[in-house]
Swiss-Prot record:
Keywords: Membrane, Phosphoprotein, Transmembrane, Transmembrane helix
Compartment(s): Membrane
Role this protein plays: Possible tumor suppressor which may play a role in cell growth.
GO cellular component, one term: membrane
Pfam families for this protein: Solute_trans_a
Source domain of life: Eukaryota
Biased composition (Low complexity): 374-390, 404-413
Family per similarity comment: Belongs to the TMEM184 family.
Modified residue annotations for Phosphoserine: 422
Keyword Transmembrane part of the UniProt annotation: yes
Major location category of this protein: membrane
Name the UniProt record assigns to this protein: Transmembrane protein 184C
Entry's transmembrane regions: 17-37, 48-68, 86-106, 179-199, 212-232, 254-274, 287-307
């Protein structure tokens, strides 16, 4: 059924509606907070919670406005879907920390959910980069194979380098994906250990579970960020149109700062800077450390929201002829089928590697040609030169996708690859047919 006139013009009224809803929520929330302050004794804990709430009220509208603008101008789903997921990190972090600051007893549960979303953000940032590259450069593997060999960064510089091409692409994606598996697993283990009374968060001791889980999470997180950095280093030139440095710093700083400041606070507890002499309204020193971490995050997320507003701007995706209903854009934001397919693909590839089966080739080779000769062939060089010489957008859009991507018409990398593959096979058949005729 076609949309009515009201729904067809949803872009005109959705933003004022959201602004009105937010103002109403402010009118309701502020008196409740004031009433809460009058009901309780105003101590350090309550003051910290109230100040954090002010930053929360400043953070959420900035983040939600950028998310809403992406939904209004939802013209390139393969790029904007991971961006929207990344933008949700700031309000989730801020709201989660504010709740944990108010109710320290449930801090372990809400904080672990926040940390799981952290892994989800790193995965989506990698997905954003790969989606852009595979759409603009369907022959990405050939481009990688034509590049000079990239060595590992310190401290892995002694390890043998990953082969340029499909191997490097697969291992970088797998290195990021492993963190999205390790982090939820360690989160579940942390919850179980908390119920058993052996977690002891914030206390560096090899007699509790928290220390071991921190080490595991840290190693997994560092390797995921290392794979992201290596991926960017190799494809720096191809990624330059989307200005990935600012985006990478936003993701990296939020993830690393939140993690390492928790480690620093735990060290302050260990050396006695934060001691039982000053716990204020908190029951234990560990609760003070957790509350301090949550309070700092509420302030940091306000700065992160401003940074995200500029680095993940919606403006490059504004198109003159926009299509799609509000329901399509809103539902697409919650669609996780791409993640399911990606995880299934990586699991199958790891399984084939473990069983010793050969990897599936994205680009078939002739039996009489090896990797070196195929890269030197004219067809490969033409494909690389064509992909590298695509003109930039005169309107500032990210182009090279063949046509404007809308929720109704979304090109897939597989279709583009099939077209290139069929053209290549057709070119190979023509000389053989001529030789037979002669």
């Amino acid at each position: 059924m076609p949309c009515t006139c009201t729904w067809r013009n949803w872009r005109q009224w959705i933003r004022p509606l959201v602004a009105v809803i937010y103002l109403v929520s402010i009118v309701v929330a502020v008196p409740l907070c004031v009433w809460e302050l009058q009901k309780l004794e105003v101590g350090i804990h309550t003051k910290a919670w109230f100040i954090a709430g002010i930053f929360l009220l400043l953070t959420i509208p900035i983040s939600l406005w950028v998310i809403l603008q992406h939904l209004v101008h939802y013209t390139q789903p393969e790029l904007q879907k991971p961006i929207i997921r990344i933008l949700w990190m700031v309000p989730i972090y801020s709201l989660d920390s504010w709740i944990a600051l108010k109710y320290p007893g449930i801090a372990i549960y809400v904080d672990t959910c926040r940390e799981c979303y952290e892994a989800y953000v790193i995965y989506n940032f990698m997905g954003f980069l790969t989606n852009y590259l595979t759409n603009r450069y369907p022959n990405l593997v050939l481009i990688l194979e034509a590049k000079d060999q990239q060595k590992h960064f310190p401290p892995l510089c002694c390890c043998p380098p990953w082969a340029m091409g499909e191997v490097l692409l697969f291992r970088c994606k797998l290195g990021v994906l492993q963190y999205t598996v390790v982090r939820p697993f360690t989160t579940i283990v942390a919850l179980i250990c908390e119920l058993l009374g052996i977690y002891d968060e914030g206390n560096f001791s090899f007699s509790n579970a928290w220390t071991y889980l921190v080490i595991i999470n840290n190693m997994s997180q560092l390797f995921a960020m290392y794979c992201l950095l290596l991926f960017y280093k190799v494809l720096k030139e191809e990624l330059s149109p989307i200005q990935p440095v600012g985006k990478f710093l936003c993701v990296k700083l939020v993830v690393f700062v939140s993690f390492w400041q928790a480690v620093v606070i735990a060290l302050l507890v260990k050396v006695g800077v934060i001691s039982e002499k000053h716990t204020w309204e908190w029951q234990t020193v560990e609760a003070v450390a957790t509350g301090l971490q949550d309070f700092i995050i509420c302030i940091e997320m306000f700065l992160a929201a401003i940074a995200h507003h500029y680095t993940f701007s919606y403006k490059p995706y504004v198109q003159e002829a926009e299509e799609g209903s509000c329901f399509d854009s809103f539902l697409a934001m919650w669609d996780v089928s791409d993640i399911r397919d990606d995880i299934s693909e990586q699991v199958r590839r790891v399984g084939r590697t473990v069983r010793g089966h050969p990897r599936k080739k994205l680009f078939p080779e002739d039996q009489d040609q090896n990797e070196h000769t195929s890269l030197l062939s004219s067809s490969s060089q033409d494909a690389i030169s064509i992909a590298s010489s695509m003109p930039p957008s005169p309107m500032g859009h990210y182009q090279g996708f063949g046509h404007t991507v809308t929720p109704q018409t979304t090109p897939t990398t597989a279709k583009i690859s099939d077209e290139i593959l069929s053209d290549t096979i057709g070119e190979k058949k023509e000389p053989s047919d001529k030789s037979v005729d002669s």
